[in-house]
């Protein structure tokens, strides 16, 4: 599906413009935000959009993917939903060890994949670390997974999307939610996109790191039956 040799479309024009054309090949894009911010919907819509265009998406699911939502997106975005479904390889992980194995196994598909998604890369890390965001063994394992995915992205010129959860940094005299893994994970991701949800359901995506665009740029989007679509500033 090499219509654009450098980016994969997310399925939302506003997000694609924000990201400089879509999700970039050859690097890792991190989506983070609080619950219901739209992380899974952005990741899944990107995967389905890739599959509908004839590309192969590998989706490591640690969150319990809704098959009904998956089917809904296929029917909305693919002219042949059954064929598109065959282009999405879903691997379920139920604990930290299974996640690590699933991430390693993505290498088996890397030579023909266009996109690898891990949703979420830090869910089991949150459980392992308890209430303290430390750089212990659990974080090192997550960092190892990210660097493995980054090496696949660079070697095979594919795109990687990982979703990340948040915590409240009470030690920083702020109630602002911050991404789990902090600077460690940000170091290994080429793009960091923060997602927020506003009253009425409108979401905002804000660039916090990008290899070619300034930090702070943002776009509004909304979640629909067909995935994700642009929203105007008047909607929130």
Curated annotation (Swiss-Prot):
Keywords linked to the UniProt accession: ATP-binding, DNA damage, DNA recombination, DNA-binding, Nucleotide-binding
Domain of life: Archaea
Binding residues annotated for ATP, in chain numbering: 33-40
Keyword presence, DNA-binding: yes
Pfam family, one: Rad51
GO molecular function, one term: damaged DNA binding
Biological process terms in GO annotation: DNA recombination; DNA repair
InterPro entries hit by this protein: AAA+_ATPase, DNA_recomb/repair_Rad51_C, DNA_repair_and_recomb_RadB, P-loop_NTPase, RecA_ATP-bd
Known role: Involved in DNA repair and in homologous recombination. May regulate the cleavage reactions of the branch-structured DNA. Has a very weak ATPase activity that is not stimulated by DNA. Binds DNA but does not promote DNA strands exchange.
Family, as annotated: Belongs to the eukaryotic RecA-like protein family. RadB subfamily.
HAMAP family assigned: RadB
NCBIfam families xrefs: PRK09361.1-1 (NF006861), recomb_radB (TIGR02237)
The protein's name in its UniProt record: DNA repair and recombination protein RadB
């Amino acid at each position: 599906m090499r219509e654009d040799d450098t980016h994969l479309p997310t399925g939302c024009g506003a997000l694609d413009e924000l990201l400089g054309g879509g999700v970039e090949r050859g690097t890792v894009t991190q989506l983070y935000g609080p619950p219901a911010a739209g992380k899974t919907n952005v990741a899944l819509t990107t995967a389905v959009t890739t599959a509908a265009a004839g590309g192969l998406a590998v989706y490591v699911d640690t969150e319990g993917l809704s098959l009904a939502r998956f089917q809904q997106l296929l029917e909305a975005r693919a002219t042949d939903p059954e064929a598109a479904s065959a282009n999405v390889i879903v691997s379920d992980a139920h604990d930290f060890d299974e996640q690590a194995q699933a991430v390693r196994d993505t290498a088996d598909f890397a030579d023909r994949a266009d996109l690898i998604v891990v949703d979420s890369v830090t869910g089991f890390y949150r459980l392992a670390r308890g209430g303290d965001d430390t750089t212990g063994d659990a974080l090192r394992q997550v960092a190892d997974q990210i660097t493995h995915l980054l090496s696949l992205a660079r070697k095979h010129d594919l795109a990687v999307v990982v979703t990340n959860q948040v915590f409240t940094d009470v030690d920083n005299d702020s109630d602002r939610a911050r991404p789990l893994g902090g600077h460690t994970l940000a170091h290994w991701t080429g793009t960091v996109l923060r997602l927020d949800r506003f009253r009425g359901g409108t979401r905002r995506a804000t660039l916090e790191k990008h290899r070619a665009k300034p930090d702070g740029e943002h776009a509004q989007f909304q979640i629909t039956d067909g995935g994700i679509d642009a929203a105007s500033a008047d909607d929130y």
